Amino acid sequence: MTQRAGAAMLPSALLLLCVPGCLTVSGPSTVMGAVGESLSVQCRYEEKYKTFNKYWCRQPCLPIWHEMVETGGSEGVVRSDQVIITDHPGDLTFTVTLENLTADDAGKYRCGIATILQEDGLSGFLPDPFFQVQVLVSSASSTENSVKTPASPTRPSQCQGSLPSSTCFLLLPLLKVPLLLSILGAILWVNRPWRTPWTES
């Protein structure tokens, strides 16, 4: 086999290594939560990875960034800041919970299994079994976004409460003046002197 033929077969060989790893861990491709709330991602794996460490990290998931949260040994539950990983070997799943979400938590994450090569410090030679999750964070919960019915405006001419307001005090004299004038006019009209018509002699 020539050197050129070997170089041409190298990408195919790497693809064969990657495809099995990409299919051994599964879960949702997209999850959504609201700011201040929590969301959970359930990751399912094959039985052969039952005793392996499980991890959660943000893409591109570089170890030097120290943003990876990983179970270790017999620990079934690991917590780091707002991330909790709970392994359930009985049903071959592990759950990742993100608490107190912020807008900055939105992005792409990796839900994966730590291989032996990675545990031995040989990270990067073989791809870990994992799948990618898109985390979406909404600005507010649906309850906060609900439309509130505006209060009915009060009429300025109405007097509410047991004690009249200052507005009512101002309106009452204005209403009494025309009423008094009407009554006074009626009294004067009734009591006016009647003229006796002149009789012709």
From Swiss-Prot:
Glycans are attached at residue 100. GO terms for biological process: neutrophil chemotaxis; regulation of innate immune response; signal transduction. GO terms for cellular component: extracellular region; plasma membrane. Keywords: Disulfide bond, Glycoprotein, Immunoglobulin domain, Membrane, Secreted, Signal, Transmembrane, Transmembrane helix. Residues 25-168 are extracellular. Expressed on CD16+ monocytes and myeloid dendritic cells (at protein level). By contrast, not detected in lymphocytes nor granulocytes (at protein level). One of its GO terms (molecular function) is transmembrane signaling receptor activity. Residues 25-123 form the Ig-like V-type domain. Residues 1-24 form the signal peptide. The keyword Disulfide bond applies. InterPro entries: CD300_family_receptors (IPR050671), Ig-like_dom (IPR007110), Ig-like_dom_sf (IPR036179), Ig-like_fold (IPR013783), Ig_sub (IPR003599), Ig_V-set (IPR013106). Disulfide bonds join 43-111. It comes from the Eukaryota. Residues 190-201 are cytoplasmic. SMART domains: IG (SM00409). The chain crosses the membrane at residues 169-189. Interacts with TYROBP and HCST. Belongs to the CD300 family. May play an important role in innate immunity by mediating a signal for the production of a neutrophil chemoattractant. This is Protein CD300H. It comes from Homo sapiens. The gene is CD300H.
